[in-house]
Amino acid sequence: MAGKYKKIVIVTGGSSGIGRCTASALRDSGCIVYEFSRRNIPMEGITHLSVDVTDENAVNSAVKQIIQKETKIDAVINCAGFGISGAVEFTSTDQAKAQFDVNFFGTVNVNKAVLPFMRHQGNGHIINISSVAAVAHIPFQTFYSASKAAISSYSYALENEVKPYGIHVTIVELGDICTGFTQMRQKSILGDNEYGGRISRSVSQMEHDEQN
């Protein structure tokens, strides 16, 4: 089989930004790449699977589909995510839950799906994309920061669970990068007057830093 000696890699959030660049780089290095995202933006040499990472059944089905074809999964890179910004007191619980559903639980869903296969094969590499926001505690990005801190803490503990089975876990805490993430951020300046204009200034600074 042509793919027998090639690395089989899943990249989530591969339709844009860091995920798309990662998927392209892996393809160019000779890996067989499966890209999970809701949007199908075709990339030559990369297989798109329509997967919402918050849908555990869809994730499990996609992973099984890959195993049936390739018989293994060497690595997964969890890039799927988005950001919200605004004051905590003006952010709804539903908005906060949605942030965690994608950024944290989406990562958990994918990892849970691949772990049984990696454990059985005795090797694998899980790479979870976190952020400096996990440790920098950026105001008015509180729920985004919390979701990334959850990923980092989870990843350190997961590494201790699975390393006896030949599975490695890597956390990447990225800084500001110029991608479409800035335009996709769900921004809110509700309460800006109550906070002395600090919310709008903070959001503007975030956008400036990410574009430079």
Give the residues covered by each predicted segment.
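Substrate-binding pocket helix/loop in short-chain dehydrogenase/reductase
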Residues: 87-88, 95-97
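Residue(s) in the substrate-gating loop at a strand-loop-helix junction
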Residues: 131
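SDR active-site lid
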Residues: 164-212
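N-terminal Rossmann NAD(P)H-binding glycine-rich loop of SDR-like oxidoreductase domains
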Residues: 15, 23
